[in-house]
């Protein structure tokens, strides 16, 4: 599928892109993440693949856990576009290797270190489009964190 900026064609769309979409912070298999210029404490995640629905999954997950004790592990979702193609989320800061927790809640399965960051001094997951909350529930059980991407370094 096309890069997100290719969706923004025409004067209005180009102007919106210029005003709202800031520095590119990263990309994954189906989304690109940018600073949200109107409020740099937020990021905008733009879906680049059809039928993946990770933005919608994160939005729904946040709505389920927002008022639970488990919310402390998640970067809050602020808003989502009606079709789910764009999601606004609180911006986290990158973690140093020594800041990665040794244990995580059992429902986190995509334990790539770059899926986590710091928000107000707390380690949170900012990429939770894939998780095991439905299968494992909102358990307080902790497991050893397997930071699989660090083995490559």
Model feature map: region roles:
Residues 1-22:
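Juxta-kinase regulatory segment immediately upstream of eukaryotic protein kinase catalytic domains
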Residues 8, 20, 24-26, 119, ...:
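Intrinsically disordered, low-complexity segments enriched in small/polar residues
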Residues 17-25, 75-76, 105-106:
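Short secondary-structure junctions
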Residues 20-70, 82, 86-87:
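ATP-binding glycine-rich loop module of kinase domains
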Residues 65-153:
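Conserved kinase catalytic-core helix
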